[in-house]
């Protein structure tokens, strides 16, 4: 008689992984969570009295080929933060507060400790975002993924009052663009990074003076989560538009928040570019157009604000220990971005 285990699926390992991750998941629970881990669906009680016209906002994303760095370094407890960050940073561009999160992990072979380490990172990202990890799926797929590899994706739902939706419609010529620093490459552009660096177990262990850490440590720095900073600032100031600088860099993402007939002018040198981007530029002999169309260049989130409020907002953020820079402005013109 042929068993499921002989086909490559270890159900007992799945049970063990759930057991190991339970405490990580529970620490993310908000009071609105109505279910324990292991049910068929996650229940979340929505307090509609807090909103005049509650609008749900959803987002989904994955970590991409940054996972290859985790495989080579055998470090798996931070990529979950990346997964959460990529989702929640998207929905806060609409002004939405993240409520809950679900993850999907597909593995070639279920190693319970490894899966628990991944979920630990997801839980950490949820705590940083103030949202609850109310469900997920770990799929063991023998013959589909190599035994030491996996994929990781997530899904989040948030909420915003209809009158407080941030959609960029009020952005006008003369408005200023405020940039919030990134922690590093974040989770986009890693196919190019890997082509330029050709990562191996050995070179990822090498200390790079200009980075101040090993190459592996730099490439695995978790994506910065901006939820608490953005939720704080939109509660005190009018933020006209927000752009999460992900795949496509400045060139693709800034126009997503700007109305037709307006153009963004980005001033080079107005913020400190992280050393990793100088390294990548040199390795690939990349022109500005290409590198700004791929990487975040040290700015992970951009806000459009009234010009008269820009300095005040930056001072407020500074008082909270958050760096921010006026990195450009809005002008009339054909849709697009100028890197000046």
Curated annotation (Swiss-Prot):
It comes from the Bacteria. It is an enzyme of class 6 (ligase). One of its GO terms (biological process) is adenine biosynthetic process. Keywords: ATP-binding, Cytoplasm, Ligase, Nucleotide-binding, Purine biosynthesis. Its EC number is 6.3.3.1. Gene3D superfamilies: PurM-like C-terminal domain, PurM-like, N-terminal domain. GO terms for molecular function: ATP binding; phosphoribosylamine-glycine ligase activity; phosphoribosylformylglycinamidine cyclo-ligase activity. Coiled coil: none annotated. It is found in: Cytoplasm. SUPFAM superfamilies: PurM C-terminal domain-like (SSF56042), PurM N-terminal domain-like (SSF55326). Pathway: Purine metabolism; IMP biosynthesis via de novo pathway; 5-amino-1-(5-phospho-D-ribosyl)imidazole from N(2)-formyl-N(1)-(5-phospho-D-ribosyl)glycinamide: step 2/2. CDD domains: PurM (cd02196). It catalyses: 2-formamido-N(1)-(5-O-phospho-beta-D-ribosyl)acetamidine + ATP = 5-amino-1-(5-phospho-beta-D-ribosyl)imidazole + ADP + phosphate + H(+). HAMAP family: AIRS. Belongs to the AIR synthase family. This is Phosphoribosylformylglycinamidine cyclo-ligase. It comes from Ruminiclostridium cellulolyticum (strain ATCC 35319 / DSM 5812 / JCM 6584 / H10) (Clostridium cellulolyticum). The gene is purM.
